[in-house]
């Protein structure tokens, strides 16, 4: 292995000089032995100098320090040894539970599966969340994005999906925390223990592996931690298992790239993003796919800066997804949670040939009623409800009930709401909304539909409200 020395340090980017006949390849891992720091080569600048990103803090690193070339990209533990463990970007355990004792390691950089290896599935993944199952159903082996600005509930929605799917799911899960709050990662770990998905006494009985590169970490960690998690998920998939991959948050992956892009000497692109934004996103997303041996179903939270869905980062992510769940600040302001916008959210699965005519007609019926209500809002604001035709008054009444029926108490939010979470089957979801569209429940007050599970609960709630009023 060749060795070199540090010649320049600019924050997270470090230049290292090697003998000209043994220059490291791009993506090779370098180690600063004295500091226990790993670097990843990004560019070859010529004259034996390479530019690398530090996978850790560069404090205390000085010019002239010796650097060793490992001759290979960053390798992380893969396989069942990772289950129940929390690891960092390099695959080192950070849960204070001893070494990982892996039998196999894999490079975090690899090519996406070839076209003839890919497999598509039309099987639906039931989430138990009414609004998702109705208007933007998830495909098993598909890619899902949860889009939303700050504080509208991306992480809570993701935690509920993990609670509903991962705990019921017979396969394995990988959770990659990319640049999010350490507190949330900590809460998630203990929730998984309570649910029995993580067994700290017998790791081999655990069903989830966790990889964290949190907000306080240098950009190198946040840039590569998603690839570390994906590498672990790929190994399970290639062994023929069905894997769930949760990534919170894809935007922080992009942001980490933006932070180091200028330091790497690249010219900024639109809104200051790196010029390689689409390529970096493609490299990650093309690997998150299902093959003929196994499937990866990924659920990714995507932060939307300033609630602008046309921002280059979320806009680039849209192209890769099968289902997009858009969280709306306006809906959250009404107190309707989950604050999912049924008009903005979409899914490739919303096709009568896949989900059936009944489900399709119900979903489109709900969307058309809500769209009509949206159009009438301006008239109502100026002239009031009295100026509407009888037909429009009925539409508004049904739309308001539908809006409230799209809300649902979550298990993970029980500490805030004091209500037990509800999981609603797809059959109950469809029949409930069909009844609302057909006018079956026109006589019930709209408040009866707020924060309930199935339609039977709404009817029961209406009865109690009537008794109270009497």
UniProtKB/Swiss-Prot annotation:
<dbReference type="Pfam" id="PF22919">
    <property type="entry name" value="ATP-synt_VA_C"/>
</dbReference>
<dbReference type="InterPro" id="IPR027417">
    <property type="entry name" value="P-loop_NTPase"/>
</dbReference>
<dbReference type="InterPro" id="IPR005722">
    <property type="entry name" value="ATP_synth_F1_bsu"/>
</dbReference>
<comment type="function">
    <text>Produces ATP from ADP in the presence of a proton gradient across the membrane. The catalytic sites are hosted primarily by the beta subunits.</text>
</comment>
<comment type="similarity">
    <text>Belongs to the ATPase alpha/beta chains family.</text>
</comment>
<dbReference type="InterPro" id="IPR024034">
    <property type="entry name" value="ATPase_F1/V1_b/a_C"/>
</dbReference>
<dbReference type="InterPro" id="IPR004100">
    <property type="entry name" value="ATPase_F1/V1/A1_a/bsu_N"/>
</dbReference>
<dbReference type="Pfam" id="PF00006">
    <property type="entry name" value="ATP-synt_ab"/>
</dbReference>
<dbReference type="InterPro" id="IPR003593">
    <property type="entry name" value="AAA+_ATPase"/>
</dbReference>
<keyword id="KW-0406">Ion transport</keyword>
<dbReference type="GO" id="GO:0016887">
    <property type="term" value="F:ATP hydrolysis activity"/>
</dbReference>
<comment type="subunit">
    <text>F-type ATPases have 2 components, CF(1) - the catalytic core - and CF(0) - the membrane proton channel. CF(1) has five subunits: alpha(3), beta(3), gamma(1), delta(1), epsilon(1). CF(0) has three main subunits: a(1), b(2) and c(9-12). The alpha and beta chains form an alternating ring which encloses part of the gamma chain. CF(1) is attached to CF(0) by a central stalk formed by the gamma and epsilon chains, while a peripheral stalk is formed by the delta and b chains.</text>
</comment>
<keyword id="KW-0472">Membrane</keyword>
<dbReference type="InterPro" id="IPR055190">
    <property type="entry name" value="ATP-synt_VA_C"/>
</dbReference>
<keyword id="KW-0375">Hydrogen ion transport</keyword>
<feature type="binding site">
    <location>
        <begin position="148"/>
        <end position="155"/>
    </location>
    <ligand>
        <name>ATP</name>
    </ligand>
</feature>
<dbReference type="GO" id="GO:0005886">
    <property type="term" value="C:plasma membrane"/>
</dbReference>
<dbReference type="GO" id="GO:0005524">
    <property type="term" value="F:ATP binding"/>
</dbReference>
<dbReference type="InterPro" id="IPR050053">
    <property type="entry name" value="ATPase_alpha/beta_chains"/>
</dbReference>
<dbReference type="InterPro" id="IPR000194">
    <property type="entry name" value="ATPase_F1/V1/A1_a/bsu_nucl-bd"/>
</dbReference>
<keyword id="KW-0547">Nucleotide-binding</keyword>
<dbReference type="Pfam" id="PF02874">
    <property type="entry name" value="ATP-synt_ab_N"/>
</dbReference>
<dbReference type="InterPro" id="IPR020003">
    <property type="entry name" value="ATPase_a/bsu_AS"/>
</dbReference>
<protein>
    <recommendedName>
        <fullName>ATP synthase subunit beta</fullName>
        <ecNumber>7.1.2.2</ecNumber>
    </recommendedName>
</protein>
<keyword id="KW-1003">Cell membrane</keyword>
<dbReference type="GO" id="GO:0046933">
    <property type="term" value="F:proton-transporting ATP synthase activity, rotational mechanism"/>
</dbReference>
<keyword id="KW-0813">Transport</keyword>
<dbReference type="InterPro" id="IPR036121">
    <property type="entry name" value="ATPase_F1/V1/A1_a/bsu_N_sf"/>
</dbReference>
<dbReference type="GO" id="GO:0045259">
    <property type="term" value="C:proton-transporting ATP synthase complex"/>
</dbReference>
<keyword id="KW-0139">CF(1)</keyword>
<keyword id="KW-1278">Translocase</keyword>
<keyword id="KW-0997">Cell inner membrane</keyword>
<keyword id="KW-0066">ATP synthesis</keyword>
<keyword id="KW-0067">ATP-binding</keyword>
């Amino acid at each position: 292995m060749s060795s070199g020395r540090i010649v320049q340090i600019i924050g997270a980017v470090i230049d290292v000089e090697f003998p000209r006949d043994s220059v490291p390849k791009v993506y090779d891992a370098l180690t600063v032995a004295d500091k226990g720091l790993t670097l990843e080569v990004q560019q070859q600048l010529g004259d034996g100098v390479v530019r690398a990103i530090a996978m850790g803090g560069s404090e205390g690193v000085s010019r002239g320090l010796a650097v060793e070339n490992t001759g290979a990209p960053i390798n992380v533990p893969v396989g069942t040894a990772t289950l129940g463990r929390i690891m960092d970007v390099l695959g080192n355990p950070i849960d204070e539970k001893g070494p990982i004792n892996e039998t196999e390691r894999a490079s975090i950089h690899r090519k996406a599966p070839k076209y003839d290896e890919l497999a598509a599935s039309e099987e639906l993944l039931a989430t138990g969340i009414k609004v998702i199952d109705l208007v933007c159903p998830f495909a098993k082996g598909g890619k899902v994005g949860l889009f939303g600005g700050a504080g509208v509930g991306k992480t809570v929605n993701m935690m509920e999906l993990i609670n509903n799917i991962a705990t019921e799911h017979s396969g394995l899960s990988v959770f990659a925390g990319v640049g999010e709050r350490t507190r949330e990662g900590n809460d998630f770990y203990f929730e998984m223990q309570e649910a029995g998905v993580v067994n700290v006494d017998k790791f081999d009985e655990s069903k989830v592996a966790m990889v964290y590169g949190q907000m306080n970490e240098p950009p190198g960690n946040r840039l590569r931690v998603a690839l570390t998690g994906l590498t672990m998920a790929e190994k399970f998939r290639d062994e023929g298992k069905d894997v769930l991959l949760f990534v919170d948050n894809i935007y922080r992956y992009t942001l980490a790239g933006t932070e180091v892009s200028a330091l790497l000497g690249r010219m900024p692109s639109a809104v200051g993003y790196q010029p390689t934004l689409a390529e970096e996103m493609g490299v990650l997303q093309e690997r998150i796919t299902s093959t003929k041996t196994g499937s990866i179903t990924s659920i990714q939270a995507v932060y939307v800066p300033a609630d602008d869905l046309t921002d280059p980062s979320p806009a680039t992510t849209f192209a890769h997804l099968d289902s997009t769940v858009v969280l709306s600040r306006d809906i959250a302001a009404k107190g309707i949670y989950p604050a999912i916008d049924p008009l903005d959210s979409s899914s490739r699965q919303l096709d009568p040939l896949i989900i059936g005519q009944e489900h399709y007609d119900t979903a489109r019926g709900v969307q058309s009623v809500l769209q009509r209500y949206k159009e009438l809002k301006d008239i109502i604001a100026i002239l009031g409800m009295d100026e509407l035709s009888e037909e429009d008054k009925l539409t508004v009444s049904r739309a308001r009930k539908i809006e409230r029926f799209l809300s649902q108490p979550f298990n993970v939010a029980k500490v805030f709401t004091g209500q037990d979470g509800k999981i609603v089957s797809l059959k109950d979801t469809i029949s409930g909304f069909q009844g609302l569209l057909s006018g079956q429940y026109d006589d019930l007050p709209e408040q009866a539909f707020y924060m309930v599970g199935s339609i039977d609960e709404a009817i029961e709630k209406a009865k109690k409200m009537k008794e109270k009023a009497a």
